[in-house]
């Protein structure tokens, strides 16, 4: 701790002596370098930066309590109320170092409890030294930002915690009013936070004590590098920084060197594992009958909560319309929807008023969607990690779950790559071709209607018996 504090003091003195601009130029170069190449190696080069490294196995049983980690009684009591019975591996290893004042690099997958791993130390520090604009958490997506805010609010409920979510797609003026109320914690996407730093009168982060970058690998993959650079330039150099990421790529390594001081690196090993209570299946089907097989699977699992993953926004919308035309409660989730519609879709799915979510990979990481019974991969993802993240939406918190991959003749190479990474072959889903093809005529009609609607053709008289139902469901999408 003394070493980290000494380095922070040196940084603060540089700011006072006017040499901050040189450091900021160095930061700018470091961060902007992270976005130069799309073909960088997945694993980082050896860094000259020294840090303490802790490796922990995800399957390792935890015997410590939150109190054993040094967490204060009031937060421990809140953890009990939230049913956080024992710390997860990432929490058990990172929280004690964070409470000592160390910067943290946390390498862990979604569902590992990493949000609480950085929220608890921030809240404990805030409890001991309450002041506004204490912490900023940066997230790559709007949905994840709201999820993080909910976790902070739950853990900080006994403290009267004030939070503000600042993301794109929402009203700037409303957000400016929320910022003027001096929240303790701001959860933001980088681009919108920069908008407020540059345009919202009276708003600054000069008193900031904590910066958290969650899912840093995605922040950089989504080319937030220039925005991160601007943020790092205007916040105090004497602060605590937590960087959490699913992978330690070379881009993340550069970001770590530019923004952290003497960090502790806590890595939770997963080895491309899926949950033991997850049943994984595949269905080989000709591409032209893919929709028919999908509808058969949905029919066989009617009443269950399911997420169907598609590769493109267009397919997400089309499949949603197709299923709704057939009477299923399906809602889409993709980047072309307004923020209100996206939150409305998530709320309806979480509450159970709609039980089928058709999503692009925006929903495969970071979102806490409980009690999903089935994941269907309509399109095979292009890499094994995405597959792990997708099927990880089910079989959570000890529950059983099931996943099915639809594999056409065009997906074989990708599918075999995933089997190789998993180290096992997936079982074939039990079905009878005759039973599947009984759906083909109805599916073809519903599909034509969906495509016609997406093209915006009028054809009111020619179009189908599905029109009234479509209009009703369209209104449902945007509801909160």
Swiss-Prot record:
Keyword list, A-Z: ATP-binding, Helicase, Hydrolase, Nucleotide-binding, Nucleus, Ribosome biogenesis, RNA-binding, rRNA processing
Subunit structure: Interacts with the SSU processome.
Subcellular location field: Nucleus
Domain Helicase C-terminal, residue spans: 277-437
Written domain comment of the UniProt record: The Q motif is unique to and characteristic of the DEAD box family of RNA helicases and controls ATP binding and hydrolysis.
Residue ranges annotated as motif DEAD box: 214-217
Catalytic activity: ATP + H2O = ADP + phosphate + H(+)
Binding site for ATP: 108-115
The organism of origin for this protein: Yarrowia lipolytica (strain CLIB 122 / E 150) (Yeast)
SMART domains reported in the protein's UniProt record: DEXDc, HELICc
Cytoplasm keyword on record: no
TM segment ranges: none
Name the record gives this protein: ATP-dependent rRNA helicase RRP3
InterPro entries: DDX47/Rrp3_DEADc, DEAD/DEAH_box_helicase_dom, DEAD_box_RNA_helicase, Helicase_ATP-bd, Helicase_C-like, P-loop_NTPase, RNA-helicase_DEAD-box_CS, RNA_helicase_DEAD_Q_motif
Upper classification of the organism: Eukaryota, Fungi, Dikarya, Ascomycota, Saccharomycotina
Similarity-based family: Belongs to the DEAD box helicase family. DDX47/RRP3 subfamily.
Oxidoreductase in keyword set: no
EC number(s) on file: 3.6.4.13
Annotated function: ATP-dependent rRNA helicase required for pre-ribosomal RNA processing. Involved in the maturation of the 35S-pre-rRNA and to its cleavage to mature 18S rRNA.
Disordered, as annotated region: 1-63, 450-480
Residue ranges of domain Helicase ATP-binding in the record: 95-266
């Amino acid at each position: 701790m003394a070493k980290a504090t000494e380095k922070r003091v040196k940084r603060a003195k540089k700011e006072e002596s006017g040499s901050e601009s040189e450091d900021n130029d160095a930061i700018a170069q470091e961060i902007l370098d992270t976005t130069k190449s799309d073909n960088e190696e997945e694993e980082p080069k050896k860094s000259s930066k020294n840090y303490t490294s802790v490796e922990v196995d995800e399957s390792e049983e935890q015997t410590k309590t939150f109190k054993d980690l040094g967490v204060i009684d009031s937060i421990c009591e809140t953890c009990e109320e939230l049913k956080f019975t024992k710390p997860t591996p990432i929490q058990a290893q990172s929280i004690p170092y964070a409470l000592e004042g160390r910067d943290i690099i946390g390498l862990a997958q979604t569902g590992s409890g990493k949000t609480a791993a950085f929220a608890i130390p921030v809240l404990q520090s805030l409890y001991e030294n309450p002041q506004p604009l204490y912490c900023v958490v940066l997230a790559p997506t709007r949905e994840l930002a709201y999820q993080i805010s909910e976790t902070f609010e739950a853990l900080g409920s006994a403290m009267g915690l004030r939070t503000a979510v600042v993301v794109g797609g929402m009203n700037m003026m409303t957000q400016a009013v929320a910022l003027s109320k001096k929240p303790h914690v701001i959860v933001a996407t980088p681009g919108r936070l920069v908008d407020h730093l540059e345009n919202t009168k009276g708003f600054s982060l000069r008193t900031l004590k904590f910066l958290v970058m969650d899912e840093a690998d995605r922040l950089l993959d989504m080319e937030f590098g220039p925005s991160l650079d601007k943020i790092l330039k205007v916040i105090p150099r004497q602060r605590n920084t937590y960087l959490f990421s699913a992978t330690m790529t070379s881009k993340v390594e550069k970001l770590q060197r530019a923004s952290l001081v003497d960090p502790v690196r806590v890595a939770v090993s997963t080895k491309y594992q899926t949950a033991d209570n997850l049943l994984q299946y595949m269905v080989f089907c000709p591409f032209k009958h893919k929709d028919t097989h999908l509808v058969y699977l949905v029919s066989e699992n009617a009443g269950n909560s399911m997420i169907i993953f598609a590769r493109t926004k267009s397919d997400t919308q089309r499949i949603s319309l197709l299923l709704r035309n057939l009477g299923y409660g399906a809602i889409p989730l993709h980047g072309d929807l307004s923020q209100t519609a996206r939150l409305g879709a998530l709320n309806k799915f979480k509450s159970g008023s709609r039980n089928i979510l058709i999503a692009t990979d925006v929903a495969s990481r970071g979102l806490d969607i409980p009690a999903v019974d089935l994941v269907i991969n309509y399109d095979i993802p292009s890499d094994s990690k995405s597959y792990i993240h997708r099927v990880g939406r089910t079989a959570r918190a000890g529950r059983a779950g099931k996943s099915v991959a639809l594999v056409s003749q065009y997906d074989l190479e990708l599918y075999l790559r995933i089997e190789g990474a998993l180290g096992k072959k997936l079982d074939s889903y039990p079905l009878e071709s005759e039973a599947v093809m009984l759906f083909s005529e109805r599916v073809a009609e519903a599909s034509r209607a969906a495509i016609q609607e997406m093209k915006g053709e009028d054809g009111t008289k020619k179009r189908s018996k599905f029109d009234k139902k479509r209009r009703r469901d369209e209104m449902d999408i945007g509801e909160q």
